[in-house]
Amino acid sequence: MKFAICNEMFEGWEFGRVCEAANSAGYCGVELAPFTLGKPANEITPRERKALREAARAWGVEISSTHWLLAHTTGLHINSPDSAVRKRTIEYLVHLIHLSADVGARVMVFGSPKQRCISEGITPEQAWNLAVDTFRAISPALEERGVTLCLEPLAPEETDFLNTAAEAARMIREFDSPHIQLLLDVKAMSSESKPIPDIIRDNRSVLRHFHANDADMRGPGFGNTDFVPIAAALKEIDYQGWVSVEVFDFSPDPVTIAVKSMDYLKSVFS
């Protein structure tokens, strides 16, 4: 099991400095939110991509994954009834696949709650089918570049589409592909009625990436979420992927969050 930390909480930091802080806190990976690079994925030059890889390598960390894929974009949506919108979305996701592969990330996390809500005027079934079509259209690029797209179930207060791990797993089964798998997020799982360890065990066959956070949106160990049974379940299923710290409350500061989260994770996974 490897530990990473998401970079967006280091607001305004140069990427090399983020990698330095991650390494200093004990992480071996950084999860990259493309919007933090300040421009669309297709505008990031080969030289800039190389610089990101080299910054990570210089500080002894990997770029583990990318997430918040469609954040800070306009006019993109995976289940829009407008075929032109879906075409643009597919094209941009392919750009993100190439960006991810170019910087060394082998996992892309599809959360993007606003760009997946059920579009106005269509049924949930129609939204499902359109989303499946969108993901199927990017499958060749995923396979070509050796990248896995992980669908992230999110709580109903964030989106009305793919709210449970069971729903995400059902969609994943439509593809039967090692390149479309599952991410589980502790905060999101806290909204489900089923205990988090049971969700982990039930989805062992498709679980590829994991977000560690507290139900209160802070880092692991900052709130009341008990990670001991969560860590036990991950070890029970012999999970070998990344455990990545993702927070939504950036206080008191990124270094404190990184250090205390890592200390807590080490204690529960030891």
Name the predicted role of every residue range.
Residues 55, 63-66:
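Conserved alpha-helical segments that form or flank metal/cofactor-binding pockets of metalloenzymes
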Residues 36-40, 72-79, 116-121, 157-158, ...:
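A short acidic, helix-capping loop that chelates divalent metal ions and anchors anionic groups
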Residues 31, 65-67, 109, 150, ...:
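Conserved beta-strand positions in the central sheet of alpha/beta enzyme cores
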Residues 30-36, 65-75, 112-113:
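Short, conserved active-site loops that position catalytic residues or coordinate cofactors/metal ions
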Residues 42-49, 82-86, 121-128, 161, ...:
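Flexible, glycine- and charge-enriched loops at secondary-structure boundaries
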Residues 1-26, 50-53, 57, 104-106, ...:
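Histidine-acidic metal/acid-base catalytic patches
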Residues 33-53, 112-119:
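Glycine-rich, proline-tolerant flexible connector loops at the mouths of alpha/beta enzymes
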Residues 16-17, 55-59, 75-181:
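Active-site acidic/histidine proton-transfer and metal-coordination neighborhood
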